[in-house]
Amino acid sequence: MDGTVTLSPAPTDLPPVSSLDAGQPTLPPEAPLAMPEQSLREGSLQVRHQRTSPMGIGLRRFYLIGGTLTATAVAVWVMLSVLWPGGFSVLEGCLLGLFVLLFAWIAMSFASAVAGFITVVARAGRKLGIDPDAPLPSLHTRTALLMPTYNEDPRRLLAGLQAIYESVAETGQLEHFDFFVLSDTTREHIGRAEEQVYAELCDSVGGHGRIFYRRRADNAARKAGNVADWVRRFGGNYPQMLILDADSVMTGDTIVRLVAGMEDNPDVGLIQTLPAVVNGQTLFARMQQFGGRVYGPIIAFGVAWWHGAESNYWGHNAIIRTQAFADHAGLPSLRGRKPFGGHVLSHDFVEAALMRRGGWAMHMVPYLQGSYEEGPPTLTDLLVRDRRWCQGNLQHAKVVGAKGLHWISRMHMMIGIGHYFTAPMWGMLMLVGIGIPLAGAGIDLAQGLPFSPARYWHGSSDGNAIWIFVCTMFVLLAPKLLGYIALLLNPRERRACGGAIRAALSILLETVLAALMAPVVMYLQSRGVFEVLAGKDSGWDAQVRDDGKLSWPALIRSYGGLSVFGLFMGTLAYLVSPSLAAWMAPVIVGMVVSIPVVAVTSLRRTGLALRRAGIFCIPEELDPPKVLVRASELRRAAALEPSLI
């Protein structure tokens, strides 16, 4: 398994492309690779222990699982001391079951975050010989950069690709790279615009014979089918392919180091970077990118620490060994009707699992900077995307039991499924926590005491319930605290995020806004789960990339029902008891104010005002990399051009 691919000659004799209508070629000669459909019912794990696995990987996973189980066992023992006195009701049994699952969930995240914090502070975790501080290595193979697109603004899309192209050219190793725009666009006017902008790009940078464009007539299997079609037609020319998203930007330095990492490690099938979220303008986008910049490394370094050579694939900003992908990542069509049947939606997890089954190592390198993406501008846009991810992740229930998968690959899928089931579980936990005192000891009509869940739980077993609440909140918020401490210990990052005080204020504001949005997210994720289980498909629409521009009628349609429901529940709770209303206030308030919160956080001027105040700052704003500056320049220039779509 040396990953060797027979190379065809580089297409150097293609004529300039000034107009697609003139019939000039936009693609290189084909070099097909067979990409057979993989079976989920047959297969075996080819290599159990990878050469590139870090030392002590078994102990790392023992720490994660053992720490999770130990913390959960202690929490359950304390919870039993609260519930057991006076008998054990059905509601209390439901509460305990929900508590066990949810506490184990956050305890595992906490244990992983602690490992990530230590790795970040110790500046450890570098692997595969990829050293961002070393001289730039020389390359010996060819790599294709693939940018799939679906009904995107072509000027904006190709501005990002041009910035990447120029950055790669600055490394002096452009001859080792070809660039492909892989269009699945279904709207004819956008397709025609893509062709025009592609021709302009080739003329602008002299990219004839190195930048290519292909539009599928049938966009079967969505993005996964788009990439698979390229592999089957052109993959034989390229030992590696680097997958980009429509909003991806990467530096040439990072791309060259990724390719060198693949060349130096012939048993590695995939290397995933940690894309930093950038270019946020709205308040929501800026709080998201700040959180990703401060907390994201703690989480990413943590999972990379215990993933080892069984890391996951996020679908973009990753380099893949083409032959390994062709041999093992051909996705089957799942039996049954949508939403569980049909083409695999969240294809990246499954492709990674199948490649690992085939004996290839999968790695994440979160320390390698120079990889960027953009986030949704509004909560509404995030939830639209999240609904699609929800369906894709729940669909993995049909894949997780496939023959021969590594147990860590199965764990990736189970975590993805569990992420969406936790939303309705948190809601049920809250309702059961109120229902227990409401059904029993919390009401004492003889003494005329008002109903008070807080008084009931505080009086249970010497206040152990309060300790459970405090510990749960600490475990939930610990990644934020650890991220802030790591920031303080890095003077350069600290200054780039506005300094210690502004960073602390940013974390506080982000936590408050996230808490206000949490009931909305919980409700809509829960609804998404039930819609998927009821058979409702999510569809496939182009993503919003710039500011959200949400109208008040659209906000009222999206969140008006939730606000009315919050008012109804708040009024009902107050009629039962003001104490009950106070207990439910964090959830009720989030529902009631959902419209103004989403509206304010969707505003560009609010986000930019906070930027001027030094709130939600990230290093890429204080000292932006050249590739991001260039991409922004090109996109601003494109915005001045007459619209093509």
Swiss-Prot record:
<dbReference type="GO" id="GO:0005886">
    <property type="term" value="C:plasma membrane"/>
</dbReference>
<feature type="transmembrane region" description="Helical">
    <location>
        <begin position="554"/>
        <end position="576"/>
    </location>
</feature>
<feature type="transmembrane region" description="Helical">
    <location>
        <begin position="62"/>
        <end position="84"/>
    </location>
</feature>
<feature type="transmembrane region" description="Helical">
    <location>
        <begin position="99"/>
        <end position="121"/>
    </location>
</feature>
<dbReference type="InterPro" id="IPR023725">
    <property type="entry name" value="Glucans_biosynth_gluTrFase_H"/>
</dbReference>
<keyword id="KW-1003">Cell membrane</keyword>
<keyword id="KW-0812">Transmembrane</keyword>
<comment type="pathway">
    <text>Glycan metabolism; osmoregulated periplasmic glucan (OPG) biosynthesis.</text>
</comment>
<keyword id="KW-0328">Glycosyltransferase</keyword>
<comment type="function">
    <text>Involved in the biosynthesis of osmoregulated periplasmic glucans (OPGs).</text>
</comment>
<feature type="transmembrane region" description="Helical">
    <location>
        <begin position="581"/>
        <end position="603"/>
    </location>
</feature>
<dbReference type="GO" id="GO:0009250">
    <property type="term" value="P:glucan biosynthetic process"/>
</dbReference>
<keyword id="KW-1133">Transmembrane helix</keyword>
<dbReference type="Pfam" id="PF13632">
    <property type="entry name" value="Glyco_trans_2_3"/>
</dbReference>
<dbReference type="InterPro" id="IPR001173">
    <property type="entry name" value="Glyco_trans_2-like"/>
</dbReference>
<feature type="transmembrane region" description="Helical">
    <location>
        <begin position="466"/>
        <end position="488"/>
    </location>
</feature>
<feature type="transmembrane region" description="Helical">
    <location>
        <begin position="417"/>
        <end position="439"/>
    </location>
</feature>
<feature type="transmembrane region" description="Helical">
    <location>
        <begin position="501"/>
        <end position="523"/>
    </location>
</feature>
<keyword id="KW-0472">Membrane</keyword>
<dbReference type="InterPro" id="IPR050321">
    <property type="entry name" value="Glycosyltr_2/OpgH_subfam"/>
</dbReference>
<keyword id="KW-0808">Transferase</keyword>
<dbReference type="InterPro" id="IPR029044">
    <property type="entry name" value="Nucleotide-diphossugar_trans"/>
</dbReference>
<dbReference type="GO" id="GO:0016758">
    <property type="term" value="F:hexosyltransferase activity"/>
</dbReference>
<protein>
    <recommendedName>
        <fullName>Glucans biosynthesis glucosyltransferase H</fullName>
        <ecNumber>2.4.1.-</ecNumber>
    </recommendedName>
</protein>
<comment type="similarity">
    <text>Belongs to the glycosyltransferase 2 family. OpgH subfamily.</text>
</comment>
<feature type="region of interest" description="Disordered">
    <location>
        <begin position="1"/>
        <end position="28"/>
    </location>
</feature>
<keyword id="KW-0997">Cell inner membrane</keyword>
